[in-house]
Amino acid sequence: MTTVAYAAVTQSGLSFDRQLWMRPEIVPGLRELTDAVHKEGAAAGIQLGHCGNMSHKSICGCMPVGASSGFNLYSPTFVRGLRADELPEMARAYGRSVNLAREAGFDAVEIHAGHGYLISQFLSPSTNHRKDEYGGSLQNRMRFMDMVMEEVMKAAGNDMAVLVKMNMRDGFKGGMELDETLQVAKRLEQSGAHALVLSGGFVSKAPMYVMRGEMPIRSMTHYMDCWWLKYGVRMVGKWMIPSVPFKEAYFLEDALKFRKEIKMPLVYVGGLVSREKIDEVLDCGFEAVQMARALLNEPGFVNRMREEENARSGCK
């Protein structure tokens, strides 16, 4: 299955210019894409999410919203915490996006509940400082996720597969750890989701925990419009955003703990660059694997793995 990422469920959920956001007028173009994927014999999925505070007024057309009010240095911008009465409509936006995905010919949706985006911002004690029923205890912090999943599963019905990408760890002190994220996974299992994609990291606080390797400071700052932020990141970025060494299957140790406790299908992602390691991961009981960078490096890598037992991507 080929998954298209990332598509915002509302305009306020856009994190970059020219990003997809789900609305009726883009359905015909997406249908062309899914028709092409299906013609090649594959299934098509689309990742749906809302970036929360990871945006800017110049991108999303409004003051960015999040689990709590504050200032996000990553954007950089002030952020308005969503009111409790706004949350049901935000959850319904996820459901509407599932319906649009169906119209566009997608076979599956992947709900993005990780990496410090909106659902993740509600889940993490680092970004959720609310004093109402959506903040404080883990049970409260999961309420918005529960609301979203109710709308998603209702819209998905019996003909759309629903995967959820979630964090096993946020990747920094004060973020979510396994004791809480295992509970999140069990709640998602109860929600009726069909599979979990196990990831980790927080784009605004621990981006290289997600991707591993050295932070591409020059490439990242090239696209920054704010001159003082660009200068600051180039000067102190490598200390503010430390590198995290890359190794093959870098999330496997944590993912195996989920495999032991969670009965539903699990998808492994993170550092897969060889057929040998993919076979090893699948032998550990994961129903599927997900790749991104290896396929950007070599779009035909999956086809080559069919032919070569020792196939390895040039991606590092």
Task: Please provide the spans of the model-predicted regions.
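Flavin-dependent oxidoreductase catalytic cores
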Residues: 1-316
